[in-house]
Amino acid sequence: MNSLISKAFSAAKKEDRPALLTYTVAGDNTKKKSLEILKSISNYVDICELGFPHNTPIADGGQIQTSAYRAIKNGIKINDVFSIVKNFKKIKKNKPIILMGYYLSLIHI
């Protein structure tokens, strides 16, 4: 398979370096700022990972839990996460992005 993710790992391997992936919680700060943050970090990484905020992120560390709570407090919804990705891919169509979330959040879509 020749996905953007496999291409990113192949490019890093050719350069004899590890691939750099970053994670940010969608909606942390604001929806608009979340897109700006994602665009900004994408300039320096191989793959972006964007998390769906969850109200009980027990499997995450403290910093991600706090980010998720802020995002929820700011009104982020699951459809907003997809909107952020859609707008991001309009600008950075060749940058791989991985979505991460809890199964229980996603089955209710």
Predicted regions, residues:
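Hydrophobic faces of well-ordered beta-strands that scaffold small-molecule active sites
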Residues: 20-22, 48-50, 97-101
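Active-site beta-loop-alpha junctions enriched in small/polar residues
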Residues: 25-27, 53-55, 100-104
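Glycine-rich anion/phosphate-binding loops
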Residues: 28-42, 75-83
